[in-house]
C-alpha cells in the first residue's frame, strides 16, 4: 500500500514522477522516509512544538505496535488451539490476523526508525520488501473481508447450497488464493521502489514510477480494486443478510406464538431443538441444520453424526421455534461484529487511499493541505487497523473471550489448593446427607441385592 511521505528538512532534486518530498508528483512509500512532520522549513516551527509532536508520534506508534503484536498473536493462538472456534468464518479471521501481524512486524519498525534517524539505513532489499509486504497485507485483509461477507451471505441466505462447499478445506483454498492474488497484484511495488539520495548523507525509500500517468493509473486501480468494489460487494452482502435475519426473526416469532397456541389446544408436548424445516423469507431460505455452531457459523461434523442427527429428528414444537430464534440471534451477533470490523477497516484506510489519489492528480495541493500533523495522523490511522480487530473480538465475541480465558488457564494452571487440616481439638467433618446417600447407593450397587 502506498503512503505519502513528507520531509521538512530535505529538498528533492526537482519535480517529476519520482521526485522527492514537497515537489509535485511525489509518490512515496508508507512514510518510511527521512520525514519529519511538515514541508515547512525547520526554522518556522518551534523546537518545543516539534519535540512534542515527535514524542506523541513515538508514543502512539509504540502503543499501536505492541497492541498489534500482542492482540493478533492472541487471536492466532486462540483460534489455533480452540477446537470449538474452528469454523469457516474463523478461518478467514485467522488469515486476517496473520496479515495484520505481518503489517505490524514488517512495516511499523521500518516506518518509525527512519523518521527518528533522518535517513533510511536499511538498504534497497529492505526498502523493496517493506513496500511489497505492506501492499500484500492490505490486499489480503480486503480480500478476506470480502470472502467473509460472501461466506456469511451463503450460510444465512443460501444454506442448502452453501453446505456443499462450505468446509474448512474450501476455506483454506480460498485463503491461499487471496494471498497468491495479493502477491501478484503488488509486484509493481518492489519493481518501482528505490533508495534514493535526497541530500547530504540522507537516503529515502520511495516509489519512482516511469511517468505521472502510470502513477495515476496505479492509484485509481488500487482505489477501485481494494476499496470501492469490495465496499460495494460487502454492502450488498450484509444488506441482504440483515434483511434475511430480520425476516427470519419475525417469521420465527409468529411461528412460536402459533405453535404454542396449537400445542395448548391439542395438549401436545413441546418438541426438541433439532433441525427444523426450511422456510422462505424474501427470496432467501433459512434452515436450521445440524453442525451449525451456537455463533451461527458452520462446523464440520463427522458423517456418522450427521446421519444420526437425521435419523433422530424430534417432533417440531415450541422448543424448536425458540431454538431457531436463538440461532438467528446468534447469527445476528456475529454479523454485527463482522460489520464493525469492516467499518473500522475502511475508516482506517479511506484517508490514505484518498490522500494517495489526491497526490497523484494534484501533488502541490495535496502537500499544502496534508503536510504536518494531518499526514502523521493518516499514517497512524492506517497502522491502527492492525490492532482494532482483537479489541472487537474481545468486546463483541463472547465465545472468543471464553476461549481466551481457557487458553490462559491452560498455559498458566493454578496450583491445587491444599485442604486445611483439622486442629487436634476439632472434630472431623461430618459427611453431608448427599455424601451419605451417594455412599449408601454405591455400597448397595456394589454388594448387589443381598
Swiss-Prot record:
The chain crosses the membrane at residues 58-79, 88-109, 132-150, 171-189, 220-242, 337-358, 377-397. Stomach and brain. It holds the Pfam family 7tm_1. A lipid is attached at residue 411 (S-palmitoyl cysteine). Glycans are attached at residues 7, 30, 36. GO terms for biological process: positive regulation of cell population proliferation; positive regulation of cytosolic calcium ion concentration. Residues 1-57, 110-131, 190-219, 359-376 are extracellular. It is a multi-pass membrane protein. Residues 258-277 are annotated as: Disordered. One of its GO terms (cellular component) is plasma membrane. Keywords: Cell membrane, Disulfide bond, G-protein coupled receptor, Glycoprotein, Lipoprotein, Membrane, Palmitate, Receptor, Transducer, Transmembrane, Transmembrane helix. PROSITE patterns: G_PROTEIN_RECEP_F1_1, G_PROTEIN_RECEP_F1_2. Disulfide bonds join 127-205. It comes from the Eukaryota. InterPro entries: Cholcskin_rcpt, Gastrin_rcpt, GPCR_Rhodpsn, GPCR_Rhodpsn_7TM. GO terms for molecular function: gastrin receptor activity; neuropeptide receptor activity. It is found in: Cell membrane. Residues 80-87, 151-170, 243-336, 398-450 are cytoplasmic. Belongs to the G-protein coupled receptor 1 family. Receptor for gastrin and cholecystokinin. The CCK-B receptors occur throughout the central nervous system where they modulate anxiety, analgesia, arousal, and neuroleptic activity. This receptor mediates its action by association with G proteins that activate a phosphatidylinositol-calcium second messenger system. This is Gastrin/cholecystokinin type B receptor. It comes from Mastomys natalensis. The gene is CCKBR.
